[in-house]
Amino acid sequence: MEQTPITDAEKVRIVSDFILHAPPGEFNEVFNDVRELLKNDTLLKDGASHAFAQYNKDQLTPVRIEGTDHNAIISEHNDLGNGRFYDPRTKQAFKYDHLRKEASDYQDVEADATAEPWRAALDLETLAYTASHYRHGVSSVFGKAQGNQITLTICIEDHQFQPKNYWNGRWRSQWHVTFQAGSGTAELKGVLKVQVHYYEDGNVQLVSSKECRESVVVSNEQQVAKEVIRLIEDAENEYQLAISENYQTMSDTTFKAMRRQLPITRTKIDWSKIVSYSIGKELKTQ
């Protein structure tokens, strides 16, 4: 039976799917593999460029900001379109190269006058929290106002890339709160994500996420900032502890239940030591 040739559109869809599911720290390896499979750089660049951008935004990819001692985060919350993003801390917009992971062509931008005092106060607290809890952590805080509603968004990213030891991992958390200045309470919503890929003598991925909801009393900028970070700290500590406990339980039960007398690889696994295979451990609070 004659096979129907794969169309360019289908090739782009498949390649884009590979790109979007690249494990943390392994974008370049996946890109090079699909480039070799496709053997058409023009089609790859023109057809899958949206996947490069989406991957970097989904992963909360950190980027170095010229002339500063901090990194910013690439995300959907600071996407200005046409490949440009902005850093609210330095109030600069920039062009971002999604393959080179570099910023260029900086321009000053004007902050949202209503949201900025709240954003700046929360940014200071977030910086201190990230520095004390995440060894290589990067954070960005975004603010915008619509009418009398202020929305603040916190993005936190940390990663450990250890290709020489055959594993890579990333922590991501995003938090949002919308409120009216100086009145009532507001709901703080968060999404926490951990992804680790371990590939020595096998191929194992840990992918975990959790949604959180908390209540915040709204009074002034400093009080809201401190209360939001207190709630974030409690929620993220609880989540990280739960992952560690779950992982230990899996080592003691699930992994042993999956054992075979001799795996398909024909190589025996020391199931009693599988908990030491590094998955998730390096993303715990330092």
Swiss-Prot record:
Keywords: Actin capping, Actin-binding, Cytoplasm, Cytoskeleton. The keyword DNA-binding does not apply. PROSITE patterns: F_ACTIN_CAPPING_A_1 (PS00748), F_ACTIN_CAPPING_A_2 (PS00749). GO terms for cellular component: apical plasma membrane; F-actin capping protein complex; WASH complex; Z disc. GO terms for molecular function: actin binding; protein heterodimerization activity. The keyword Cytoplasm applies. InterPro entries: CapZ_alpha (IPR002189), CapZ_alpha/beta (IPR037282), CapZ_alpha/beta_2 (IPR042276), CapZ_alpha_1 (IPR042489), F-actin_cap_asu_CS (IPR017865). It is found in: Cytoplasm, Cytoskeleton. GO terms for biological process: actin cytoskeleton organization; actin filament organization; barbed-end actin filament capping; germarium-derived oocyte fate determination; negative regulation of actin filament polymerization; negative regulation of filopodium assembly; negative regulation of JNK cascade; nuclear envelope budding. F-actin-capping proteins bind in a Ca(2+)-independent manner to the fast growing ends of actin filaments (barbed end) thereby blocking the exchange of subunits at these ends. Unlike other capping proteins (such as gelsolin and severin), these proteins do not sever actin filaments. Belongs to the F-actin-capping protein alpha subunit family. Component of the F-actin capping complex, composed of a heterodimer of an alpha and a beta subunit. This is F-actin-capping protein subunit alpha.
